Amino acid sequence: INFSSIDYVFNCLPNENLHKRSDLLKSDVSIIDLSVDFRLDDKNDYENWYGFKHGNFEVNDEFQYGLTEFNRNKIKKCKHIANPGCYATSILIPLIELIKQNAIKTDDIVIDSKSGYSGAGKTKGKKELIKEVNENIRTYGIGDHKHIAEINQELSKIKNIQTEVFFAANILPVERGILSNIYIDTNEVSQNDIYDILQKRFNDEHFIQLLPMNEIPSSREVVGTNNLVIGLKKGYKENKLCIVSVIDNLVKGAAGQAVQN
């Protein structure tokens, strides 16, 4: 391929492919990468979390983690973009501003996410996937899901404090959509203060919607859109709160966010 006539390339190949493409990486074309190959800052994390040795880590710094709502200015200046993972997108967007404002505790964040079976990609045939998930719910990646690496990485950057979440994923018998329940403890602020922080931060963000307090979104609301919808539910104690976020894993969690970036 003659890359000199191309401005942008969207890499939609599976993980462990782009980092081997020295010809593309050393060209002048800008890459929007939907794989994991350039999401992580630590070379060892690729081997520890994904089981492969990175072949072109020297260009890793040319990739900006592409969470548009928080990295807009950096994206404008970078050469390449590493598109965030689908689960990570649904989790990071509701949490980043709250951690910036020191509004929540970061040492006990628990996340339970549910995804449609399309999140498995094309490693299995559609009929086989439907058969596997029909009348079934399956939990996987408890404490060791691969997206934990980028979630911890991006949350730890906010206040330069190591942050580690406890995360589990579930596959549901629906084709698409992600719903993440994020359980947090507030940090000497009220639950209404949490709501106000999110409302102020996302008021002008086209693709982010915050529902009224105690209204909970469902995945059906966002299927086929690039939207992320957030709901807050007050807990049994004043410092307990559940954040519910929903996205379409194939749009905001993948292709739509790539175009947005």
Residue ranges of model-derived segments:
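Short, electropositive, low-hydrophobicity segments enriched in small/polar residues
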Residues: 89-92, 123, 181, 252, ...
